[in-house]
Amino acid sequence: MSLLVVGLNHQTAPTSLLERTSVSAEDIPKVLHDLAEGTHVSEAVVLSTCNRIEIYAEVETFHGGVADISDQLSRICGIDLGDLAGHLYVHHEARAIGHLFSVVCGLDSMLVGESQILGQVRTAFRAGQAAGVAGSALSGLFQAALRVGKRAHSETSIDAAGASIVSVGVRLAASGLGLHSEVPAVPVAPPGGRALDGGGVAAEGPRHAVTPEPPPLAGTRVLLIGAGAVGSLAAQTVRRAGAGEVVIANRTAARAARVAEAHEARVVGLTDLAHEITMADLVISSTGASGLVVEHELVAAALPGRAGRPLVFLDLALPHDIDPGVRELPGVSLIDLDALRIALDGAQVTHDVEAVRALVAAEVASFLDRRRAGRVAPTVVALRAHAAAVVRSELARLHTRLPDLDDREWSLVEGSVRRVVDKLLHAPTVRVQELAGAPGGDAYAEALRELFDLPREVPAVVSAPDLDLLERS
């Protein structure tokens, strides 16, 4: 049995392919049961978000597990496996554990450091549990991953890294509008500390009088479509960039109102998009809609009222919110996630990202030690149960041969036999648990099973006199 993850994400697949991979919450139980009914997958969890689809599994065999999961992903995407294979990644054991820990910390997200993935991983795990397909192996893995994710966000300022993609998008948008394009970094308070500036240094007041650069979005009107985590971050970013007016359109008015209150914005309904696009300079969209939110015809109808002013769309959604065809319209620019991915290729890795990577590495090592020790525990229990049975049998035989011993004498004999057996077992059982943490540690447990002809199933019931032998290790 081993851990395995097979999937594709924004780093391995184009946006056009990722748009076809989403699995609804209603369909996940069927996907899980289809996997479990195969011969190679014993446990499974499906993680499906805007930027990835991954199947984590405990598998009987590596190659069989990869084949079963890859076939399932092919069916989900509606793409021939031969065409899909080039976009898939496969991680096994330590690399699978490290991948999940990195994902839950936001290190593998398009928006690095974003915390929404923590809730998405929790939801995926609960769906696996509800379907009865996430057993003890994946339960231990996902519970550990969620703890690591919480530590990353509470003990570091990894959230600050998440602001980078929005800041880069706004910088590109300001450039598209012909404006100064240096966007101030969004300050993020470190755990127990002051707000950090863009370089990770506690911000202080200026020491010398300087002539400030004009805000990159000074005097502009910004329309935000979507009020989720990315939309809220976008509102904060454009406000710091000096936007003159911020308008928020969202399907849920109450959520939009909360974001608007925090960032001095105005709320409109989605039915008002045509008018608001006519008035806006920059439109940033980040909804979770399954189809287009802003279509070509809607934008074309808004252009006559703009008097030739440039209009920039920043599409942070996946699947796309903005019709790619708007690029063909005069005076209209579109910046999408693919463009942002290129712009971010050379971005400097922040100190907090490195801190989280170190945290992940340490937690992976700790989890592997626990996992290996857990694998050898049944062998230790079986060995001590076997020894206890032998002691019990031999003491019974000895008792019939020495019927004249009184209780005190018999107690001394019984104690001596048990101590001898316990001392003989102590070194091998302790050593095999130590060796279990090393690569190939399972082989030592298997050797004990073969040498002592131990059963594969751990005894469920042990009599009270044998408890000492079973519990010592």
From Swiss-Prot:
Gene3D superfamilies found in the cross-reference section: Glutamyl-tRNA reductase, N-terminal domain, NAD(P)-binding Rossmann-like Domain
Chain residues that bind NADP(+): G226, A227, G228, A229, V230, G231
Keywords per UniProt: NADP, Oxidoreductase, Porphyrin biosynthesis
Site (Important for activity): H99
Single GO MF descriptor: glutamyl-tRNA reductase activity
Entries under NCBIfam families matching the protein: PRK00045.1-3
Entries under PANTHER family matching the protein: GLUTAMYL-TRNA REDUCTASE (PTHR43013:SF1)
Name under which the protein is recorded: Glutamyl-tRNA reductase
Organism of this sequence: Frankia casuarinae (strain DSM 45818 / CECT 9043 / HFP020203 / CcI3)
Lineage: Bacteria, Bacillati, Actinomycetota, Actinomycetes, Frankiales
Gene that this sequence comes from: hemA
